[in-house]
Amino acid sequence: WGDISSNYVQAHWVATHLPKFVEGQRNAGLPEDPSQWSIAKSIFVADNADTAIKYARDESGPYGFYFTNIQKKLLKGRGAMGLGLFKVYPDQPDEDVSVHQSLETQVIAGGVEDVVEQILELRQIIGPFGQLMYTGHDWADIPLSRRSMELMAHEVMPRVNKALGESAD
């Protein structure tokens, strides 16, 4: 088991996890190693950006269903505090938080190059981390979902690793 920052938490909040993660390692007498920290992100890759955006950012699709449910559950369990995880900026008014906004800001989606670029941008916001955990959502379209995982494994991650100067362990 290891430490994972959730896919539904905005990147600016996830960036605050790294200093605490490293502090925890230090306090436990472990080497300070961000590569032991994992980030989960909702990701969808398609052969073209239009297909990916239509599938992953449609409020009535599987990603929309996921964000609708997680927002309802966190709002019920944590009240307005739960909405904070979805805010694009800390002072964003609660009434401006929406599923549409989450799909636009928390789902990495597009063609191969789009997704590579979005992952590298995420890395710049968050800082170094070990594994990127691809969070897929209900496979409403099985061939499209399978293709997304294939593109992620065979096209996206090799390009991300090359850009970061890392091997694909």
Please state what every model-predicted region is:
Residues 1-169:
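Active-site-adjacent structural elements that line small-molecule/cofactor binding pockets in enzymes
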